[in-house]
Amino acid sequence: MAELGELKHMVMSFRVSELQVLLGFAGRNKSGRKHELLAKALHLLKSSCAPSVQMKIKELYRRRFPRKTLGPSDLSLLSLPPGTSPVGSPSPLASIPPTLLTPGTLLGPKREVDMHPPLPQPVHPDVTMKPLPFYEVYGELIRPTTLASTSSQRFEEAHFTFALTPQQLQQILTSREVLPGAKCDYTIQVQLRFCLCETSCPQEDYFPPNLFVKVNGKLCPLPGYLPPTKNGAEPKRPSRPINITPLARLSATVPNTIVVNWSSEFGRNYSLSVYLVRQLTAGTLLQKLRAKGIRNPDHSRALIKEKLTADPDSEVATTSLRVSLMCPLGKMRLTVPCRALTCAHLQSFDAALYLQMNEKKPTWTCPVCDKKAPYESLIIDGLFMEILNSCSDCDEIQFMEDGSWCPMKPKKEASEVCPPPGYGLDGLQYSPVQEGNQSENKKRVEVIDLTIESSSDEEDLPPTKKHCPVTSAAIPALPGSKGALTSGHQPSSVLRSPAMGTLGSDFLSSLPLHEYPPAFPLGADIQGLDLFSFLQTESQHYSPSVITSLDEQDTLGHFFQFRGTPPHFLGPLAPTLGSSHRSATPAPAPGRVSSIVAPGSSLREGHGGPLPSGPSLTGCRSDVISLD
C-alpha cells in the first residue's frame, strides 16, 4: 500500500507531457485536458498496475525530478560534525537542524550531477512498424532502434551502420529500370523509416522535429514541408518512407553509414529502422485484391434488408434505396466495385481508381464516407458485380425491401416551348395576320373587353378570346404640330382594326364607350374641325371601330388631352377648312369630342365607301390609335 501511495504521489506531480507518455505507454487514450489525463492515469494505477507501468511511472518521475549527487568537496562536508566548517569558521548550515540536511541542500550551483541517472532506452525496443500496402518487405537491415538523447543539448545526433549481403545486392541490381532523362530507378529499394518509440501497437511513420539525414556523407532529400495550419505554427513534413537507394553503396564489402540529426523532445522518443523492400504498383495490388475473392452477394442483400426494415418506433419508413453505379472518384461506371468492411453504406467505388489515387498520395480514405479505408479492409462486392454484368445500360439502380433491385432509366423530359410574352394593355395579345386564303368562319371577329365586369347577369359563360387581324388606320399628323395632341398619363396602345369591310352588330354593341367620360372640354376654336378630310387617299376605308367611337362622348378625349390651342396649329388649316368643310358640317354641340371629326350619323352612312375628294395635307404621317 505504501508503494501504491508513492506511485500515486508521483503521478499527481506529472505534467501533461508525462501523463500523455504514460497513457500512451499503457495503450490508453491520451487526448484531453490535464485533469482528464490525471483521472485516467489514476484509474490506470488503481485498476491494473502492471510492473511495466510502475517502472514507467518511476522513470518519468526521475526525469521530472532528477536526484543530485555530491561532488568530492561536498562529500567532505558530510564527515564533519554538524555546525562546524572545514576552516573552523561558522557554517551557514549550523543553524539548520541535522535532520533537515539532505544531499540536495549541500550542492553548489555548478556541481550538480545525477545520483541515479535515468535508465537508458533499449537499443532494440519491441517496436513494430505498420506495413505499407505498396511495399513488400524482403529483409530487415537495421532493427527498430531508439534515437536516444545522449546529452542535454537541444539538437541530437545519432550514427548507424548497415551492410548488404551479396544476395540482397543482386536483388537490387537486377531490379534496375532506366527512366527517361538518364535516370535509373530500382523496384527493390533500401527504405528508411522513422516512428514514435511506442510498443502498444504498430506504429505509423512519424518524423522527429528538425530532421536531417545524411547517407554516406550525402544529404538525403526529405519530403517538403506542409503549409502551416495557423500563424506561428512550426512547419512539419509529411511522414513517409524515405528511399535511400540512390545514396547507398551497392557493395557487399563496404558498409553504409547513416547520420541522423533531430531536435529532442522531453517525454517523447523516436525509433529508426531500415528495410529492404520491393515497390508494388496499383495493378499488382488490384490482382492481389481479386485473389482474395469476391464477397458473397448474400452479405449485401442482408445489409439492404436491414437498412430497409421498418422501425416500429419510427413514423418514417424507407421502402426503397437508390444506389449509383458511377464511381465517385472518376465519375465513370464501376468496373471493380469495392468498399471497406468498416463502411456502413452500400455505395461502392472503383478499386482500380482508388488504388491509383493512393499510389500517388497515400491517404486511404473512403471517398463516400471519408472514413479510413485501408487496403487490408477492402472487399469486392459480389452483388454489385452481378448487377454490373446483367445491366449495362443504366447508371442507377433501386433496391427493394426484399433485397431485389431494378434499374432506374433516365427520364427524357420533353422540352417545353414557352410562348413569347404578349404585350399590350390588360394582358391582351395580338398576333399578326397572315396574308392569303382564310376560311369563311374566321371572318367574324370577337373582341373581349376586359374592362367589363365578369359578374354581369347577362353573360352566362365568358366569351372565348380570339385574335383580331390588324390593319392600320391612318390618321394624319400635322407637320410642325408637336404637342398639339398629346397623350396624358395613361399609357396608349396601338389601334387594331379588322381588315374586312363589314362587322357584326355584336361587335359594335360590345364596345363600352359609355364608360369613358371626356377628360377635358374642347375649345370653341377647334370644335368645327373635320380631321377626316386630311386623309391622304380617297379610296382608303375608315375602320368601323373608329367611326362608331367617334360618335360617342369619349372618342378621343380619353386618349388625347388637349392642352391648349396654339396659333401655329390653326393657322395653316384656316383656308382649307373654310373652302371645303365648314359649309358641309353642321355646328356641333360644345363640349362633345365627336365634334372634332363629324356627326356620327353622316359617318355611319358613308363608312363603307370611298370618301369624297377633298384636300389633304402633304407629308402627313399615318398613326394608329387604340380604343380598348
From Swiss-Prot:
SMART domains in alphabetical order: SAP
Binding of Zn(2+), residues: C343, H345, C366, C369
Pathway linked to the protein: Protein modification; protein sumoylation
One GO term (biological process): positive regulation of gene expression
Family designation: Belongs to the PIAS family.
Post-translational modification: Sumoylated.
Name the UniProt record assigns to this protein: E3 SUMO-protein ligase PIAS3
Source superkingdom: Eukaryota
Tissue specificity: Widely expressed, with highest levels in lung, kidney and spleen.
Cross-link entry Glycyl lysine isopeptide (Lys-Gly) (interchain with G-Cter in SUMO2), positions: K46, K56, K230, K307, K466, K482
EC number: 2.3.2.-
GO cellular component terms, semicolon-separated: chromatin; cytoplasm; dendrite; glutamatergic synapse; nuclear speck; nucleus; postsynaptic cytosol; presynaptic cytosol
Localization per record: Cytoplasm; Nucleus; Nucleus speckle
